[in-house]
Structures are given as C-alpha cells and as structure tokens.
C-alpha cells in the first residue's frame, strides 16, 4: 500500500482520500494483493507540490488539510497522504481510530495537535512492536516537514528488518502484476532482496 502511494507521488499525484474503505483485496486469503481505489479526489500537482483544496474524509485527513476548511491561506503537500497511511496503519494495528470524528471539535483538535504518541496508549498497544509504534508516530507527525515521505516509510526498520516478509511481499506483487495495464513490475530501490 505504501509502495502504491509512493508510485502515485512519483507521478505527482496526491490521492487525497486514502482510507480503509478505498482498499480492496485482490482475492480472499492472508496473502492477497491490496488494490487502491476511488481516485475521484486525486489531484495532479504542479510546480512546488502545493495543494489548497479541502478534500478527503475528515477522519483520515492531515491537520494541514483540515486547516484548509478553516483558513483561506492554508495549503498542503502529498505528505498529507502519508498522514492518511499512518491513520490506516494505526487502525490495522489497534482496531480503533486515532482521532475519532465523534469527539467534540476541541478535543479532536487537541488530539490532532498531540499526534500519535498519546493515542498509542493502553493494552491494545502493549503488544505492538516498538518499530511499528515508531512508524505510526512518524507518519502521524503533525509537522508535515518532519513527517515521513513514502520513500522514507519504506526504508523504516519496521519494513526492512524482516527480509522474509519483504521478500514475500515483493513476490506477491510480482506474481500479481496486471497484464491488462501494460506496466512492468519494478522493484522499489528501498528494498534489497535476492531472487
């Protein structure tokens, strides 16, 4: 999923509505390829990579995108997609949303400003690896300049410290490459594997 978004960003495309509902499994089973859908809000950005339109699903939106709804002068970059990836990873690891929309606005805004660290408390997180928690926190970094890009996320130890998992993921991608779209599967340079 992160590699898919990395590919979009390499084409200067920001998805702007990454969420669980827009992810599909190619087939049943634990080892299925994830497919990204719903490009209705996707945007090709120009010089400087600046986006200014309030777009997306609020529960997954980065703070700088939410600010576009409140201020005329606010803008954001493709790193807003990285925030959404952090929300998705948080949900998959803990089974709950880091910044629930049903909270009063002031409480939700406070949680957003605090980022992920305070949201990763309790029993749900006690069994999650330090590397996974670190990646979630780095993706849910409030400051977009300090937030991980997709390239940086793919180089994170949570992805790179288990070569067998990486190799299985790369094999799955290669085995499931689509012959319909004519694109050749390309190995991400962040992954170093042996065939």
What is each residue range found by the language model?
Residues 9-26:
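Catalytic-loop of the protein kinase fold
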Residues 52-65:
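Conserved activation segment of eukaryotic-like protein kinases, specifically the C-terminal portion
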Residues 81:
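Conserved catalytic-loop aspartate of Hanks-type protein kinases
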Residues 92-93:
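Hydrophobic anchor on a C-lobe helix of Hanks-type protein kinase catalytic domains
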Residues 96-141:
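C-terminal lobe of the eukaryotic/viral protein kinase catalytic domain
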Residues 148-186:
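Regulatory extensions flanking the kinase catalytic core
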